[in-house]
């Protein structure tokens, strides 16, 4: 929480006091500056006064203009300068949510007063939320443009299913920020800039990727299972997967439900009795017979030992299970040299 030298609520009170009664009421209602921090819509304010939404908007805009022209506004220049310096420290461009939460996370009324000071203050420029970015404010057009363009490039270079540690994403981000002043290249500022993007996101394990990806936008048990197995780094029993989901994400995961989700999702491959791995690790899907077929299809005729060696890299099974499957003459044939091939 930031400690401000001025008191935002007192500052706003002085600024709105220069307005006529109706203008003051419109501003207080519109920005949630009264006892109730709820903000009223143009329509609700219009209904209260029996005027149109457009008329309310005109009164709001005129009131802001009058405040900016007032002696009270001039007198509060040090307050606006303090906010501007805080913006500079936080990175020059920051999401509205992050900035207000930096001031306070508990006092909604105080947040509303700070927000109003950003609206009337001349150094601050708002960029509305769109498909790419959140609501954000900045104090430097050129910097804002560079940061947003760098975030676009960062997103374009991410594969849909890619996950990166935060340190690696920041390193990649810096590659696109070479023209930005060194003073901004601090980790906490770079993280704030990353949070501006709606296209890039962070999963519950702190790994970054494309925001709409299942690996980042985690919904159901199968998505949590994917992250749990990926974190484990090697094949794991479905019962342990359920335990890992509960431990890592504080989510209830019934063993049977978890097992069913692992069976249904192509991201997972059964590699032994109850043991699951990720398909992206290169494990072949299917029963042992299918794995032998895929191995022979890729490598051609192989000796019994070579087949066992290659299948055991894909499956946690007994050697005898592989040998039994090789006796299936419908699928496999043995030549004079003792090598096996597809029938």
PLM feature segments, named:
Residues 1-343:
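C-terminal non-catalytic scaffold/interaction domains in large multidomain proteins
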């Amino acid at each position: 929480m930031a400690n401000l030298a001025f008191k935002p609520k007192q500052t706003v009170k002085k600024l709105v006091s220069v307005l006529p009664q109706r203008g003051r009421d419109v501003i207080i209602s519109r920005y949630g500056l009264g006892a109730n921090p709820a903000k009223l819509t143009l329509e609700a304010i219009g209904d209260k006064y029996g005027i149109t939404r457009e008329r309310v908007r005109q009164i709001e805009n005129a009131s802001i203009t009058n405040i900016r022209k007032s002696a009270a506004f001039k007198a509060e220049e040090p307050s606006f300068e303090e906010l501007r310096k805080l913006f500079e420290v936080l990175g020059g461009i920051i999401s509205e949510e992050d900035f207000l939460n930096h001031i306070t996370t508990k006092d909604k009324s105080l947040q509303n007063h700070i927000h109003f000071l950003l609206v009337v203050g001349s150094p601050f420029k708002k960029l509305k939320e769109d498909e790419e970015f959140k609501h954000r404010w900045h104090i430097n057009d050129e910097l804002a443009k560079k940061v947003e363009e760098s975030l676009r490039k960062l997103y374009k270079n991410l594969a849909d299913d890619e996950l990166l540690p935060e340190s690696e994403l920041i390193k990649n981000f810096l590659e696109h920020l070479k023209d930005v002043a060194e003073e901004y290249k601090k980790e906490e500022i770079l993280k704030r800039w990353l949070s501006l993007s709606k296209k890039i996101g962070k999963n519950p394990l702190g790994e970054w990727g494309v925001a709409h990806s299942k690996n980042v936008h985690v919904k159901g048990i199968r998505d949590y299972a994917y992250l749990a197995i990926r974190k484990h780094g090697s094949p794991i029993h479905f019962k342990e997967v359920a335990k890992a989901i509960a431990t890592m994400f504080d989510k209830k995961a019934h063993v049977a439900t978890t097992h069913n989700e692992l069976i249904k999702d192509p991201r997972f491959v059964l590699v032994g009795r109850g043991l699951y791995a990720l398909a992206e690790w290169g494990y072949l899907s299917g029963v042992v017979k299918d794995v032998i077929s895929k191995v022979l299809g890729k490598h051609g005729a192989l000796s019994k030992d070579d087949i066992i060696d290659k299948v055991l890299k894909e499956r946690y099974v007994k050697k005898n299970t592989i040998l039994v499957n090789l006796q299936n003459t419908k699928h496999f044939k043995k030549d004079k040299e003792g090598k096996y091939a597809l029938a």
